[in-house]
Amino acid sequence: MDPISAVSEELAEIEGQINDIFRALSNGFQKLEKIKDANRQSRQLEELTDKMRDCKSLIKDFDREIKSLESGNDASTNRMLNDRRQSMVKELNSYVALKKKYSSNLASNNKRVDLFDGPGEEHMEENVLLASNMSNQELMDKGNSMMDDTDQAIERGKKIVQETINVGTDTSAALKAQTEQMSRVVNELDSIHFSLKKASKLVKEIGRQVATDKCIMAFLFLIVIGVIAIIIVKIVNPNNKDIRDIPGVGLAPPAMNRRLLWNHY
């Protein structure tokens, strides 16, 4: 018998669901390795991410169930359960690392933007023709003008980069705060979900106990009705030998015919 099943059937059920997801993740990443199309890779990564999210939620349920049973278990059992939970977390983290790796590779493969575009051949020929018709002073003036334009473009670029960095910093801080808030909300929702599942199981247990009590009461009622019926039959027909007397229930014997004796003085 599985040691976790011996501790709690609910723990064993959660472990089975987690193992099913781990098998699906293993097969999914093997399939992803063979996919060459970027769009199909992206869809496959989304499906695997959803499975990892479900697995994380189940591991949280597993941890809560361990804590709820901790006081009733011995030290070796608690150590075994905690080791199993840590093994689950480690395996899930390995799949998360794989997902990040494939996501990074996919982003790199999709990036096809050239940072610098070289001048076209016709434009280069036009510049050569213009330069051949200009004097040295004009060429120097033109060069200085182009350098000034380049310096101004660099300054504008620096300002844009600095503004982008500032916006990125503010956005990062806002996203961090929102992420922490969402994490707290998710934890609260997981706790509520776990409590609802426990309450549902408790209601089912109470329902089964009530049904059992009703069956026992019905059986006792039938016994009482049977005893009353036997007593009535014995009273109505006391000479019926087919019905035995009920132990502990005495019936008065039928009155014998008595004769009145008269004393004559």
From Swiss-Prot:
It is found in: Membrane. Keywords: Cell cycle, Cell division, Coiled coil, Membrane, Protein transport, Transmembrane, Transmembrane helix, Transport. Residues 144-206 form the t-SNARE coiled-coil homology domain. One of its GO terms (cellular component) is SNARE complex. Residues 1-215 are cytoplasmic. Residues 237-265 are vesicular. The chain crosses the membrane at residues 216-236. The keyword Cytoplasm does not apply. InterPro entries: NPSN/SNAP25-like_N_SNARE, Sec20_C, T_SNARE_dom. GO terms for biological process: cytokinesis by cell plate formation; protein transport. Its main location: membrane. Interacts with KNOLLE to form a t-SNARE complex. Does not interact with SYP21, VTI12 or VPS45. t-SNARE involved in diverse vesicle trafficking and membrane fusion processes, including cell plate formation. This is Novel plant SNARE 11.
